[in-house]
Amino acid sequence: MAHVVVLGAGLGGAIMAYELKDQLRPEDTVTVVTKDPTYHFVPSNPWIAVGWRDRADITVDLAPVMQKKGIGFVPVAAEKLLPEENRIALVDGKSVTYDHLVIATGPELAFDEVPGLGPHGGFTQSICHIDHAEAAKSVFEKLVANPGPVVIGAAQGASCFGPAYEFLFIVETALRRAKVRDRVPMTFVTPEPYIGHLGLDGVGDTKGLLESQMREKHIKWMTNTRVKRVEDG
């Protein structure tokens, strides 16, 4: 009998817990430890930012679904890992022991590495978290009411570029539906060596396909960029 703990219950952690429960022996146990009792479907964050979805549409209360699956659930943040003891110390003073540990805590966003970057004290919006996406929605609504230039993209150090392109085309579509696209010049900025690189040296003809779509939709782009700082306006 083995006890497997999954630390984190986001897109990776929740799926991993389900997969483990399906594939491990009946006598093995799985426990999820997470600071957030609610699951957010991160791929839908771009839709939140333009009002195509609401928070309730993409969130799930984890406790009942984990219980139904026979997975232990501890909605308390971890404070410290003690690998020599096979133990996780929690912020409430308690701890969870394990035989095997899966760390799925997600990325640590590095907005502080670029002055002015990020939604917390900076001048850019984000769709990395549902809270960010909701804040971006209010900014998008202001844009519709008072159209002006928009820059969308990714900064150096990003490892996943697909969402930036997705958000670019979602915003373009939402602006057209709002009948203000003609008053919103759009520019895509990326550290990729070419459009459609995606951090993967391209996938098929992503370069040609994406460049074609961006030309058709009158979206300018800048590649091989490094963002030094972001200023208001």
PLM ranges: what are they?
Residues 197-202, 212-217:
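Glycine-rich phosphate/pyrophosphate-binding loop and the adjoining helix
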Residues 2-72, 156-200:
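Beta1-alpha1 glycine-rich phosphate/pyrophosphate-binding loop at the start
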Residues 1-3, 146-147, 183, 224:
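Phosphate-coordination loops involved in phosphoryl transfer and adenosine-cofactor binding
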